[in-house]
């Protein structure tokens, strides 16, 4: 040990540069360290304290690496041992000389004085108020942060620091075979390059193990193997961990149940056999192995402190979460993902979500090009192409590619619906389906189309909608070649070819191809008409029909024919009209082969073959083919004449009668005879007139060419 070191003062660090005159002044450990008072130390959070600890250790390693032979400060000594940095006289006697710890050549007489040296050194640091406060705080902090780490792996008594970068820099210090700085950490990673073996480093660690009274035959043998491979790590006594240095694979096996885990963290969480449960709940007395489990339990007890949303009644624990959720009701949703259109209230959530798009997907499907994060996801996806269905339902024989889908399907047979909506009482077999359903009540639409701004509850609905902008129709019918934007539309279309109508009305037995059509039909029996026109008070069972009806009052006709310019209020009327120009008649009668361009005219014609008249007047018993004819007939019993002429005030029970009457005032005569040129204002008079030209006139006048039907 250098003779000029005064133990009664702060340890002055004299390096070899000072001895050979290459350095101008000495540097003390105090000159390069950061000092805190007790008040300042208490204001640091755990992350800042951890940073302080790492900086102190790194500074000390740099000083030692460039050749400064200094006494190891007490707090650094405790940090190197990875133990709680306490300062007690009982423990000081067990500490070893720091010079021998790092392999320095120390005379035998110096070793005999190591106990008094340590005592004097620690006393000096204890008298320093700031160091004393930090030591106590480090001890408390170590109790909290190192408890789980010590259970997982038991570090060696000392760690050695050799900074390869520092030692290789240009300086007057001469070091042979410099090693790499290695810290004894549980998460020590394997080196990419094989470092050179440092003889000084190896011998110092062997000597350090001997001085500390550890098992020489075991630890020294392990050290030879470690240093020979260029690595340093400590072995845990509680579990056997095998690590492949070159591949980085780690297999940890527990002692109790022999379960094999892929990572130490997984084994640590699995070791519930002998693990202590230090975290206890003050409310119910339950104990937990992890603090996160304790916090989750405490949230259950703090239900009384929840902040409830006044709009929808949803409750939140932190006030911040409630304020963020309230923006969903106000419509303030500024963060939209440009990749998939998903909406977020907070920008931080958007940034986290965007990582899913930028994340590497190495497993790619060769059939469709879709990529996945995991190989297992790719295997599941490939079953959709091969149509492989390994899991079959024992009840109905239906096959599925995944076991989870089979389990969900089997709930249909058992009738199990354990997830019920608190708003309407509707029950579901899956929790995810319930979550989607609850968005109907809350009005939450998280997926927005970036093209038109339309929002959707489910991502699948957004994907189907976006195809309307791109024109993509990936689902094609193999029978007729027609394409659709969604698989559900293709399945419904297939029923036209198969004639399948799986949805049957329980009241009248009528069947339908779609469930939505059945729901609309059932409103006829229940008389349910929720949608009422604000202008005339007429009620409808569908909102779409109400919207078309309101166009009568507004005069809006958005569908205009490009051929003749005629406009229509509904799209179905517009399509039917276009068939007049194209000559298309898709509805063909199977009885007589007659074709029609509209569905309504086709149904009217079919009744002529069946003679079916389902609409019967309850007053006189007269039956009609169409419901509109029955309504018109019933006006004769009630005396109702809703159609009034604005010119003369005359009223009529039928709208065609009003149109014929109005031609009297306008003088319009649209029906002209091609034989004689006579014109008429209604079709019935025109038809009667034409019989005068087509009738047989066998009785002729002998005086003229005029003929008569009767003699």
Swiss-Prot record:
InterPro entries: KRAB, KRAB_dom_sf, Znf_C2H2_sf, Znf_C2H2_type. Ubiquitous. GO terms for cellular component: cytosol; nucleolus. The keyword Membrane does not apply. Induction: By HIV-1 infection. It is found in: Cytoplasm; Nucleus. Residues 27-98 form the KRAB domain. One of its GO terms (biological process) is positive regulation of transcription by RNA polymerase II. Gene3D superfamilies: 6.10.140.140, Classic Zinc Finger. Keywords: Antiviral defense, Cytoplasm, DNA-binding, Metal-binding, Nucleus, Repeat, Repressor, Transcription, Transcription regulation, Zinc, Zinc-finger. Residues 1-21 are annotated as: Disordered. CDD domains: KRAB_A-box. The keyword Repeat applies. Residues 1-11 have a biased composition (Polar residues). A motif (Nuclear localization signal) lies at residues 359-362. Belongs to the krueppel C2H2-type zinc-finger protein family. Down-regulates the expression of several chemokine receptors. Interferes with HIV-1 replication by suppressing Tat-induced viral LTR promoter activity. This is Zinc finger protein 175. The lineage of its organism: Eukaryota, Metazoa, Chordata, Craniata, Vertebrata.
